[in-house]
Amino acid sequence: MDTRVAVISIIVENPDATTPLNALLHEYSKWVIGRMGIPYREKNISIICIAVDAPQDVINTLTGGIGKLDGVSTKAAYSKK
């Protein structure tokens, strides 16, 4: 199974979304290379970056699931390799 390296950028504007977001990320933890979270207190949002190495369909499914959460925005950027 071919994999791709990607960075999934997430902006959380609804603090109630953090529990379902963490549960979703836990489901895909075997694909996660690393994670960085930045609380931006002045704007009351959280910025999260997830580095993954996974098949394209797994990345798309994860990103789609994250985007369905209320108050959460996400985008993925892929490596060309």
Where are these regions (language model features)?
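Long, contiguous binding/interaction regions
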Residues: 1-81
